[in-house]
Amino acid sequence: MSTLEQWLQVACAELGIDPASVDLRAVLDLTRDVARGVDRPAAPVTAYLLGVAVGRGLAPADGIARLTGLAGSWAAQHPAGEQPGA
């Protein structure tokens, strides 16, 4: 078991979450896309926002799809090095 998988088990136990309910690959893909297409610090913030939305009833897959799409459109509208509002 990798360190990430071990951490997932421990963190889920701490929060009372079934580890099987976490689509780890999808979350990692989302954070990768946000880090590359938006900004690195936006990745963990986006993961947190996804968690808040899921806690409020949004289906995880729907949230991931919406945020991945948003990150893709952001990257297309804001070429590398271009700062919005600058």
Q: What spans do the regions from the language model cover?
A:
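Generic helix-packing signal
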Residues: 15, 35, 55-57, 67, ...
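Predominant activation on well-ordered alpha-helical scaffold segments within soluble catalytic domains
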Residues: 5, 9, 32, 46-52, ...
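An acidic intrinsically disordered interaction segment
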Residues: 1-25
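C-terminal binding/interaction regions
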Residues: 9-12, 61-86
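A structural signal for alpha-helix termini and helix-coil/disorder junctions
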Residues: 17, 40, 73-77
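Amphipathic, hydrophobic secondary-structure cores in small proteins
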Residues: 19-57
